[in-house]
């Protein structure tokens, strides 16, 4: 059995939106989401610090699991619930500092080799993707598909996992059927014609996560 060294998270984190603004954080927490990630890319720390402070405050207000993507120093400074890192960030991040601060850690993976690298860090959860084609960001690898996702889930057993990449409202049930603990979504909410309805439907499917 794999065991995280970082503080644990529930196996089921529920619906896990990944958004790029405090406005979306507030909207979705108000709508009932309880696991969420702020992902702001390619800005200096001083440009994003105010947004990170505001997002963390919202997370506390709603008793939510708020992860900060990449900006681990600011996440430590302002005591976020957790940090999410890509593979490319692992070598340049002080993982011991994150752990010492008591923050949870999530790590992205795209194949078996990256899963091995992630497991060596013993994070709180492992993200598996991208499951389907996605327009949200440039991806260096091909989509995994459901069969490969299910294979990863079988390997990781009861380790907390999050599926990400091209997961729509229609695809969400088949993704969860693989046994993955949680689903991360981006455009399924932020580009929906009615984001409130989309969020409510996805919450019905994926839930808010375990306590």
Curated annotation (Swiss-Prot):
2-[(2R,5Z)-2-carboxy-4-methylthiazol-5(2H)-ylidene]ethyl phosphate binds at residues 134-136, 166, 186-187. Mg(2+) binds at residues 70, 89. Binds 1 Mg(2+) ion per subunit. 4-amino-2-methyl-5-(diphosphooxymethyl)pyrimidine binds at residues 37-41, 69, 108, 137. Keywords: Magnesium, Metal-binding, Thiamine biosynthesis, Transferase. One of its GO terms (cellular component) is cytoplasm. It holds the Pfam family TMP-TENI. This is Thiamine-phosphate synthase. The gene is thiE.
């Amino acid at each position: 059995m794999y065991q995280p060294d970082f503080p644990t998270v529930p196996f089921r984190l529920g619906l896990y939106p990944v958004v790029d603004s405090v406005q979306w954080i507030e909207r979705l927490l108000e709508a009932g989401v309880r696991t969420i990630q702020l992902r702001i890319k390619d800005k200096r720390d001083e440009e994003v610090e105010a947004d990170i402070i505001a997002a963390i405050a919202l997370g506390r207000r709603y008793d939510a699991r708020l992860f900060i993507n990449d900006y681990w120093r600011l996440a430590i400074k302002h005591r976020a619930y957790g940090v999410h890192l890509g593979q490319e960030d692992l070598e340049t991040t002080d993982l011991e500092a994150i752990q010492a601060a008591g923050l949870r850690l999530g790590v992205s993976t795209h194949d078996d080799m990256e899963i091995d690298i992630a497991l060596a860090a013993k994070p709180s959860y492992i993200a598996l993707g991208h499951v389907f084609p996605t327009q949200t960001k440039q991806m260096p690898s091909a989509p995994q598909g459901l069969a490969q996702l299910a294979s990863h889930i079988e390997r990781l057993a009861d380790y907390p996992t999050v599926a990400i990449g091209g997961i729509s409202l229609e695809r969400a049930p088949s993704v969860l059927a693989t046994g993955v603990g949680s689903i991360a979504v981006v455009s399924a909410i932020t580009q929906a014609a009615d984001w409130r309805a989309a969020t409510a439907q996805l919450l019905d499917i994926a839930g808010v996560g375990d306590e």
